[in-house]
């Protein structure tokens, strides 16, 4: 969807650039990335739209589902069926979205950067939260940056001007409050999450169940 919105040139499409960076980080072959871009800009993809669904899983867990679809009727039916089969309920627009903050995030190598000094520098570019995190997979000390969704492009450009390599970046909907459940109830919610994630139109699923 990011290709359709802003074009297939990663230099002018920061969201696409992030997708390519993340694909490389996951060791996805370059040919696969290029095919995905070509597929997204083809005529067949011209009618795809982003649609967000909101609802509740069992035990009052809020669910937010991001989809990309060329047939809204099909996607609505499939998502509704997922909720119904798992004792959940599909809600109306705005019923749970207010429970989540739409954020963007970036991961960079820490190197010899002083965390506090770097945080002050990045606040001017819209960053709200900065913290150190050890990447076990890469055996690397990293810095995570979080900001509002709308600041993604500004922060990408700021990091590039500083010649800072972005290891990965993306978007999240972070619940403002989490709800704790016992193990049995968690399993019931997980069944719905898994069913939704298996649908080919679903891009991401967010919830407020405590881990």
What residues fall within each predicted segment?
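Intrinsically disordered, Lys/Arg-rich N-terminal extensions and targeting peptides
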Residues: 1-11
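Flexible hinge/switch segments at interdomain interfaces of large molecular machines
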Residues: 9-15, 50-58, 90-100, 164-176
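Ordered, soluble secondary-structure elements with a strong preference for glycine-centered loop motifs
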Residues: 10-14, 24-31, 69-77, 112-116, ...
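Residue-level signature of catalytic and energy-coupling elements of molecular machines
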Residues: 27, 33, 79, 122, ...
